[in-house]
Swiss-Prot record:
Family in the record: Belongs to the eIF-5A family.
InterPro entries: IF5A-like, IF5A-like_N, NA-bd_OB-fold, Rib_uL2_dom2, Trans_elong_IF5A_hypusine_site, Transl_elong_IF5A_arc, Transl_elong_IF5A_C, Translation_prot_SH3-like_sf
A Pfam family: IF5A-like_N
Biological source species: Methanoregula boonei (strain DSM 21154 / JCM 14090 / 6A8)
Keywords attached to this entry: Cytoplasm, Hypusine, Initiation factor, Protein biosynthesis
The name this protein goes by in its record: Translation initiation factor 5A
Protein origin, superkingdom: Archaea
GO terms under biological process: positive regulation of translational elongation; positive regulation of translational termination
Biological function: Functions by promoting the formation of the first peptide bond.
Modified residues (Hypusine): K35
Amino acid sequence: MKEQTEIGKIKEGRYIVIDEEPCKVVGLATSKPGKHGAAKARIDAVGIFDGVKRSIVSPVSAKTYVPVVERKSGQVISIAGDMAQLMDMKDYSNFEIAIPEDKKGTLEVGKEIMYIESMGKRKLD
């Protein structure tokens, strides 16, 4: 899910959709309006799920999309290799999620963990 907003209203640390991928804004620079042109904004962002750095240059008044990023909790049902099966604590739905390298030794069956969900994708927090 995503919402529409103006480029000028985006701040560092917020989220933005670039190339249909939700990204966290890490850098923001705006130029002054000139004699013949509008102010422009350069946004540098890093993908939430893939870690790829992306940037866009756009007029401040242009519209863009902002993803709805939700932090949820889930209970670990089982662990198989680098995948974990989780159950959402709100609606009790089951799903599989990849385990990042830094979390491999800390996950235990029955333990509650936080995860991020946005635009149909999930990632351990």
